[in-house]
Swiss-Prot record:
This is Serpentine receptor class J-38. The chain crosses the membrane at residues 6-26, 43-63, 98-118, 135-155, 200-220, 253-273, 285-305. It comes from the Eukaryota. InterPro entries: 7TM_GPCR_serpentine_rcpt_Srj (IPR019423). It is found in: Membrane. It is a multi-pass membrane protein. Keywords: Membrane, Transmembrane, Transmembrane helix. The keyword S-adenosyl-L-methionine does not apply. The gene is srj-38. Belongs to the nematode receptor-like protein srj family. GO terms for cellular component: membrane. The keyword Cytoplasm does not apply.
Length: 330
């Protein structure tokens, strides 16, 4: 029953919440004055559309993550793509690659905030080129991750034999029947270990390089904003700080609840540490949360959106109270 909640119901609940929250988020953005967000509106729309796509894929391609001794592996448990085939394997790899694409999505947001502060023409006159570059960067991240999964992460017969008893004990099925992405760091042939280490190094390098870029761009933007505060209007400077703060929160959420558990699953098998099954449940569940948690965080971080929610709440409360008052007067 717990497996059904983790792998079937929780992704569907997350998807439903994403399809409620993200349209509201987009409505808030595009009903503000156009000069408030400028072209940044379209990057936020791109972000919301990505969240909707990811939430659907999270339901259609449900994954399970497990580790055993020196091996980490990811399999498909339910849905349309369980039967072993190259196409179904690519669907599993694509599910992982979408998570990697979110690195690119966050990166283009940080670059945009940096360029706005320096009044770059890419944020104004040539914004269509910036959006094109943003799309291409997201595709590049996706393709890079997909390629690594195919050439280095594809579970060999040796790896499947290594985890055969563990899979039979945990899932009641044979390891040869699963579409599997994995790494095997020890107790294996040189080729298997080499591919596993190379895959992990490349995955880690992409992750660390992306997060480092966020930090550098955020620090440079803050430094420039502090200089600008002397010349720019207080309102403009304050709003730019609020947008950057919202972006930092937007970035921290997937890093903490989604990417950090991934790193643990990659690295604990290096030392032969087997994580408890409950941690695997947590990780699978957490990977689906940011598609609706992130927009909520942005809405709550920006005062203009908080005020609109507050005003809506007050108006709704007042309209509900008025009929009851009239009834008492009668």
């Amino acid at each position: 029953m717990l497996d059904d909640w983790i792998y079937i119901f929780l992704p569907r609940i997350s998807c439903a919440l994403a399809w409620v929250v993200n349209p509201i988020f987009v409505y808030f953005i595009f009903t503000e004055k156009s000069q408030t967000f400028g072209n940044y509106r379209y990057l936020l729309l791109f972000f919301a559309l990505f969240n909707l796509l990811y939430s659907v894929v999270n339901v259609v391609v449900p994954i399970d993550i497990h580790n055993y001794r020196y091996c980490f592996f990811l399999i498909l448990r339910h849905g349309w793509f369980v039967e072993i085939s190259d196409f179904h394997y690519h669907m599993a790899a694509g599910r992982c690659s979408l998570v990697a694409s979110s690195y690119a999505l966050l990166l283009v947001h940080f670059i945009y905030r940096f360029l706005v502060i320096y009044d770059s023409s890419l944020t104004r006159l040539h914004f269509h080129w910036y959006m094109t570059g943003s799309l291409l960067l997201s595709v590049a991240y996706f393709v890079a991750w997909q390629t690594i999964c195919w050439f280095l992460g594809y579970a060999s017969v040796e790896m499947r034999q290594y985890v055969r008893e563990e899979i039979r004990r945990t899932y009641g099925r044979d390891s040869m029947d699963f579409n599997m992405i994995g790494t095997l760091y020890d107790e294996a042939s040189y080729e298997a270990k080499f591919k596993s280490w190379l895959a992990t190094i490349i995955w880690s390098s992409i992750s660390v390089a992306s997060i480092s870029a966020y930090m550098v761009l955020a620090l440079l933007t803050i430094h420039k904003l502090k200089k600008m505060s002397c010349n720019a209007s207080k309102k403009t400077s304050k709003f730019q700080f609020e947008l950057l703060r919202a972006l930092i929160v937007q970035t921290l959420i997937p890093i903490v609840i989604s990417f950090s558990p991934c790193l643990l699953c990659w690295y604990t098998p290096i030392f032969g540490i087997q994580l408890p099954r409950e941690f695997n449940y947590f990780e699978v569940g957490a990977l689906g949360l940011f598609s609706f948690v992130d927009p909520i965080a942005i809405i709550l971080c920006l005062p203009i959106f908080r005020h609109r929610i507050s005003n809506f709440w007050k108006t709704s409360t007042t309209s509900l109270e008025e009929p009851s008052t009239k009834v008492r007067n009668i």
